[in-house]
Amino acid sequence: MSEAAMQGRVALVTGAASGIGAAVVATLRAEGATVATLDQVASSGGAASAVADLRSPEAVGAAVAQLRQHVGSFDVLVHCAGICPSGSTLEHDDALWMDVYSVNVLGALRMLRAVVPDMRGRGGSIVLVSSINARFATPGLAAYAASKAALEEMARTAALELAGDNIRVNTIAPASVDTPMLQASFARAADPAAARQANVQRHPLGRLGTPQDAAELALFLASPRSGWITGAVFALDGGAGVTRR
């Protein structure tokens, strides 16, 4: 994709400190975008950065306002931030379920509320990172999966509601991407190497996804190249979704 595709555009990337978010930041910058970053820990790589807890509407609003002062109004939001606690459906108490929803669903909503006013009347692109688990059940991930399913439905509805302002909303649903979060899940297994290999074998293409795989798709959805796409969920799964149907 040519540099002109993102030249002059201002993007905000959440979850930017590592994994998919960090790859998105580097990719958008390489294609000419001005990128601001937001995470719950300090992140680098962008023209401006802020720290905020997505559980707090006030913190999110203040952080986005701070970033806007540095880079201007936002044309693009790529929302990668989220949490993924493990535990059975009945094991998690109400507080944990609500915490997952506060970060993974309401956190995304808070980001939309913060950036959509910038895009009204001039258009924009919003890319939300979901998960294959929104469609295919995995034992031990009930709260996470339910939150990602809710995120996808919220995105589809927002796509319809914002289409009149030419604000596009799309979702990426990755399978296993080799990020620090996934590596931590392998480390908790009795045999981490075996757990990793078993996970690889679930993907017909024979490997885990990389953060760069996700970043390239996010770049396409953020750019004018995808100008007639909204309300879509893109499977980024190495074929895993085909074998699990």
Regions picked out by a protein language model, each given a short descriptive name:
Residues 131:
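Residue(s) in the substrate-gating loop at a strand-loop-helix junction
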Residues 92, 137-145, 157, 185:
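Active-site loop-to-helix junction immediately N-terminal to the catalytic Tyr of the SDR YXXXK motif
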Residues 2, 136, 219, 230-245:
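Short C-terminal tail/terminal secondary-structure segment
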Residues 117, 160-164, 227:
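Alpha-helical segment proximal to the catalytic Tyr-Lys
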Residues 88-89, 93-98, 199:
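Substrate-binding pocket helix/loop in short-chain dehydrogenase/reductase
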Residues 112, 147, 155:
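Active-site helix of classical SDR
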